[in-house]
Amino acid sequence: MRYFIILLALVALGVCAPNVKQRAADQDLLNKQQDVIQLLQKISQPIPNQELQNLGASYDIESNSHQYKNPIIVMYYAGAVKAGLVQPQGTTFSNSISQLRKEVSLLYRILLGAKDYQTFLKTAAWARVHVNEGQFLKAFVAAVLTRQDTQSVIFPPVYEILPQHHLDSRVIQEAQNIAIQNTQGKNNQQNILIPVNYSALLSHDEQQLSYFTQDIGLAAYYAQVNLAGYIQEQNQQQQQQPLTQQQYQQQIVGKYLQQQAGQQDQQANIGRGAQYLYLHQQLLARYELNRLSNGLGPIKDIDYENVQSLYQPHLRGLNGLEFAGRPQNLQLQSQRNQLIQYVATLEKRLRDAIDSGNVITPQGVFLSLYQPQGMNILGDLIEGTGRSVNPRYYGSLQAAARKLLGNAPEVENIWDYTPSSLELGEVAVHDPVFYQLYKKVMNLYQQYQQSLPVYQYNDLILPGVTIQNVDVSQLVTLFTDFYVDLDAVTGHQSQQQQEEQTQSRVRAHLKRLDHQPYQYKIAVHSEQNVPGAVVRVFLGPKHDHQGRPISISKNQHLFVELDQFIQNLHAGENTIIRNSQQAPGQSPDWPSTSQIQRGVNAAIRSQEPFYITEPHQIFSFPARLSLPKGQPQGFPLQFLVVISSSNPLNVPYGPVIPEQSLTYQDQQYQVVSVEQYQQLKEQGQISQVGGGIQQNVEVLPENLVNAQQQVQAVRNYYANLYTKYHGQYPNTQIQNPVGQGQDMTYSVQGVGVVNAGGWLGQQGNSWSQQQVQQAQQVQQQMQAAMAAVQQSQQRHQHAAQMIYGHQQSHHGLHINSSPSSVQSGQQQQSVLQGLGVQGVQQGVQGVQTAQGVQGVQGVQGVQGVQGVQGVQGVPGLLQGVQQVFGQGVQGMNVPYGMQRGQSGGQTWSNSQVQGVAVPGSGIVASGQQHAGGWQSIYAQPQTVQDQIVSEYYQNKPISEVIGGAISLDGKPLGFPLDRPLSLGALSVPNIFVKDVLVFHQGQPTNDITQ
């Protein structure tokens, strides 16, 4: 309720005027930013700044122990460092070794306990000189993130601090060789680029996904997510006395007991445990979508005894030893029996807790999982990084499994230790087994969700609000160039050399997945004013890897959240236009060390301001990777739009009998009306089956019968169960809708000319089977015509601007030459009306009365197509039919940069979508220009996020900011896909499902060729 009141207050202040004013750093913050940069430069060498190096070497931490909140820990740790009884420098740090975890935790607590900034700086310099590099990096970063006097300081990207952990060891070796040649005067080049192709040894399937799994931006993101699990609020770190049993129970367990007693704060239900599960579900869903885009099936189940996943990372630690890898067939039974049994035991205990509904605390208290805090409890148990209610019994499943599956060799001496990538938070996402492991973790999460009551019609309905249509501009992915500074591995560079830039600069050149910025438009009718409505947008698969339609309710774990925002709805018609770059929970590219340094230096010299970057603007998921890689002919997905009230959610928590165990007898299952269900909720409980189990209830709304016949998302609730003919993949034939064989029609989104067969999407008007057959015949004729045209075509550049017609569903057949199309907004009179043809010149004859495009000019003399007419006033249409991949694209899309066209239609201004031009391509990428982009250095004007997003994160601990999880109204993360959805829930008018295609433009892989 407290959060609801705050939300209403923000709405009253005008959430529709969302821009956040940038704040410039003062001199104090600039100095601190300078200190952090210098302490993290060339971390395996002495500090380049001689003043800091001398400070660290001369500081006597023991004699200054009174300057810390816990002097006993200072004396204990400093004595161990002086005696050489801590991890030495030059060896690789990993959380898998208990002693190393202890040392880094003590250092973190010391840094956090420094009473003032100067003491903190001296301690950091001392640790930088005397402590292991990996331990220092983790403790120092965590302390800067947590301390109040270092807020708004940002770090260099982890792949520039430790490039050895992210780039192939051969690239690192080449950079070091270049540095040696420079010192010998054999190389006078000032700027040297080393092309990087991801060369980890992977299976064939995983190699296709290397653009995602080996992405260094993804690794940097997950490094922070992993670190956040070990960061606790500052007041919890300063315990000077051991906790009594009563204090322990109150601090760790008490908040959950209060929830059971009815003291509920909806926003407080979203803690680290819930975020841990949600962020990993989202990461896994993105990986699954990219698998699907590449024609691969679901993630394979992991076997703790026999691991089938080839991986040789070709990465190395500071000691020069390469990280451990795995052969294709790894037998662990003979060498890791004890660890295998331990991991299996932890998993069984978690499954038992989910099935029984209760977690046992060290005091013998049974704590229910089926309560508002249940998600937090379960997530904390699985992660096991200090928040678990019973760490002795439940351990840390994810940490133990990483150690097992990583296959690092057992050693007795730290100098010989080489951890696996899986054990290092900053590179774990590079290992394919990471995703197999987290599929098992997500299976636990889904097992828990299946025992929660499903969302019903009453739970999701927003009375009087109807989403009439959703238009999405073109979704196009591409590979863009990126450069990584390798200064950390290219020898010592003095501060004077840094300032004068006298040494040559060695950088790695990579290609990374990105996408063009896009917009979407939501047409909403509301019968009354609805202040502070929350709009959530998800993206998920339309078909499985075999081409069969999926059920959203049964596959909600495969959907990713693209956007969330507050919208005031007024009575009548509402048109919402949203820019992809405004989305919260996503971050632009991380600024490089040199960019940060230049910004600080310029601000110190008063040349230009150094703007403060908020944590949520830099620690969220990479915006570049928010869309899965598209396909030349279009990758079919679903856009799911949900509008909900900002009122608190009132739903039961069960547990209910899972579907696989339900007999549907009357004592277990009942169908009730909307009114009956509302009465049951108002009474505070659903009927009990017995033993604390709630009865399974399904609501029958009045519109369900029609929805089962007309709404494809509702029809697909049963997925492929009632489909007579199975579809094929990838996208070469239309999937027969659920219920095929009845006297029915279905919608067709577009007919595209495809190199290997035609593809029919679904959207727009209802077409009969006969019409579809006619369309397919036309498609074959057009393919023959296009083949002749292609013989004389030449390559051209694309620019972009979207031209939209009426608000009703778009209609028409599409024949495209690239991820762009012209589409008629007129009502179809026949199969061929609205045919979109791009780049075909006059003289093409054969197909008649295809109204939709006029004045399109290109290659002459092709016989077979005639009378293509329609869109007028579009100067500058690209000449010639090019790259005829045959994508059918919904929306009236015209390539970026074209002039305004069809009179009477609605045009989306090109200025609403900002981006960065990719050199030599004429295309625009969005990763660098996402809202909150650092310093506005990439383009002007800078897109900014809504004010309410900053308000949301303002008072949260940093561990709950990192990762980008957000719920503006306090509902569960991922709502309403945090639970299964009933048929009635899918039929509410404030939920809309839109079919979309994601295209890929440019080179098909991220390889760099010379």
Curated annotation (Swiss-Prot):
- GO MF term (any one): nutrient reservoir activity
Q: Which gene encodes it?
A: Hex110
Under the cellular component aspect of Gene Ontology, which terms does the record hold? endocytic vesicle; extracellular space; nucleolus; nucleus
Domain named Hemocyanin C-terminal is located at 455-648
The post-translation modification note in this UniProt entry reads: May undergo further proteolytic processing.
Which tissues express it?
Answer: Expressed in the fat body and secreted into the hemolymph (at protein level). Present in trophocytes and oenocytes of the fat body (at protein level). Present in the ovaries of workers and queens in oocytes, nurse cells, follicle cells and their precursors during oogenesis (at protein level). Not expressed in ovary or testis. Expression levels in the fat body are higher in queenless workers with active ovaries compared to queenright workers with inactive ovaries; this does not translate to higher protein levels in the hemolymph.
Per UniProt, subcellular location reads as:
Secreted; Nucleus; Nucleus, Nucleolus; Cytoplasm
Its subunit composition reads: Probable homohexamer.
- What turns on this gene? In 5th instar larvae induced by juvenile hormone. Post-transcriptionally repressed by miRNA-34 and miRNA-210 but not miRNA-317. Induced by a protein rich diet or repressed by a diet lacking protein.
Task: Give start and end of each Hemocyanin middle domain.
Answer: 157-445
Classification from the root reads: Eukaryota, Metazoa, Ecdysozoa, Arthropoda, Hexapoda
Leader sequence range is 1-16
Name of the featured protein:
Hexamerin 110
| All residue ranges annotated as the Hemocyanin N-terminal domain in the record | 30-151
What does the UniProt function comment say about this protein?
Storage protein that may function as a nutrient supply to compensate for lack of dietary proteins during metamorphosis and egg production. Has a secondary role as a nucleolar protein that may be involved in oogenesis.
Alphabetized, the UniProt keywords read: Cytoplasm, Glycoprotein, Nucleus, Secreted, Signal, Storage protein
The glycosylation sites are 197
PANTHER family (UniProt xref): FAT-BODY PROTEIN 1-RELATED, LARVAL STORAGE PROTEIN/PHENOLOXIDASE
Q: Which family is this protein grouped under?
A: Belongs to the hemocyanin/hexamerin family.
